[in-house]
Amino acid sequence: MNAPLGGIWLGLPLLLTWLSPEVSSSWWYMRATGDSSRVMCDNVPGLVSRQRQLCHRHPDVMRAIGLGVAEWTAECQYQFRQHRWNCNTLDRDHGLFGRVLLRSSRESAFVYAISSAGVVFAITRACSQGELKSCSCDPKKKGTAKDSKGTFDWGGCSDNIDYGIKFARAFVDAKERKGKDARALMNLHNNRAGRKAVKRFLKQECKCHGVSGSCTLRTCWLAMADFRKTGDYLWRKYNGAIQVVMNQDGTGFTVANKRFKKPTKNDLVYFENSPDYCIRDREAGSPGTAGRVCNLTSRGMDSCEVMCCGRGYDTSRVTRMTKCECKFHWCCAVRCQDCLEALDVHTCKAPKSADWTTPT
C-alpha cells in the first residue's frame, strides 16, 4: 500500500521542477493591440515563431482572435462572479491575469480551456460572416441528407467549426508544443477540452418550406450555440476537474488519487491545489477579497461568511436609479418612472494585520 504513495511523493519534486514559470499565453494580450497586422504581430510579447508566422500570414484571423478575447474573458468573469477569485484581468500584464495562473491550479485549467474555446468560437463566427479570406461556410454541408424527421437539403451557411478548431490548435497550442514540461502537457490537454466543448454544442437548425408552413421541404444548416452554453459546460468541468500527476516516463498523466477515474479528453486536469484567495498575495497573484461585495442572505460562495473568509463585512447605504410604476400603453409600449431606491451594500473587510500585502 505504501509503494504507490511513495512513488507519487518521490516524484513530486521532479514534477514541480517541470512546472514552467513561463506559462501565461501571451496571445491573450492581443485584445489590446491595434489593427496594423505588423505592429500587432511584432509587439505582442512572448509569441513563438510559429505564432508570429500565422499572425503575419492571417492578419484578419488575428483581428477575430483579438476581438474574441473580450468575449471569453467576460464569460470567465461571469462564471467566477460569485467566487473569491473572479477572473480579474490586469491591463498592463501581457499574460492578462498576472501571476495567479503560474500555479497549475484548477483556475488555470479553466482559463486555458475557455480561452481555447473562445478562439474556436471567434474564428468560426468570422468565417460564417465572410470576414476571413481563408475560410467561409462549411463546404462539406451540401446536397441532401437525412435525420430523424426525414430528408432535408443542406442550405444557408453552416458554421465551419472544423476550420476554427484546426486554426485554434495550430495557433494556441504552438507555444506548449515547444515545451516538454508537465505544465505544457496540462495546458495542451485543457486547450483541447475547450475546443471540443464548442463543437459539442453545434446544433442543426432548419427552415420549413411549403404551403402554410407544412414543411414538405426543409433547408438545414449547422450553427454554434451561444457561447454561454460552452461557458456553463466548462464551469461544470471546472467543478469536477481531476487532479493528476505525471506518469513515470513523462508522456502523460495519472490520477493523483487512485479512487478517482482517469480523466477523459473532455475533462479538465490540474496539478496543484488552489490558494484560498482570501488575502492579497503579490507572489501568488491573488488580489484578495477585501472590498468585494458579498451577499448577506446567501449560503453559497458569494455569502459574506465565505467571500470575506470570516473577517466580517462593512455595510453602506447607497441609492440607485431604478424603473418603477411601469404601465402598459396600448399599443405597444411600457412606460416607467425613474425612481431612487435605497439599499444596503455589504463589502468584505480587509485583514486586520498591517502586513497583509506583500511589499513591493
UniProtKB/Swiss-Prot annotation:
Signal sequence range: 1-25
Keywords: Developmental protein, Disulfide bond, Extracellular matrix, Glycoprotein, Lipoprotein, Secreted, Signal, Wnt signaling pathway
Disulfide-bonded cysteines: 76-87, 127-135, 137-157, 206-220, 208-215, 278-309, 294-304, 308-348, 324-339, 326-336, 331-332
Xref: CDD domains: Wnt_Wnt2 (cd19345)
GO molecular function: cytokine activity; frizzled binding
InterPro entries in the cross-refs: Wnt, Wnt2, Wnt_C, Wnt_CS
Places the protein is found: Secreted, Extracellular space, Extracellular matrix
Glycosylation-annotated residues: 295
Keyword Cell wall biogenesis/degradation: no
GO biological process, one term: cell fate commitment
Protein modification: Palmitoleoylation is required for efficient binding to frizzled receptors. Depalmitoleoylation leads to Wnt signaling pathway inhibition.
One GO CC term on file: extracellular space
Record carries keyword ATP-binding: no
Family: Belongs to the Wnt family.
Function description: Ligand for members of the frizzled family of seven transmembrane receptors. Probable developmental protein. May be a signaling molecule which affects the development of discrete regions of tissues. Is likely to signal over only few cell diameters.
Name the UniProt record assigns to this protein: Protein Wnt-2
The species this protein was found in: Oryctolagus cuniculus (Rabbit)
Biological classification of the source: Eukaryota, Metazoa, Chordata, Craniata, Vertebrata
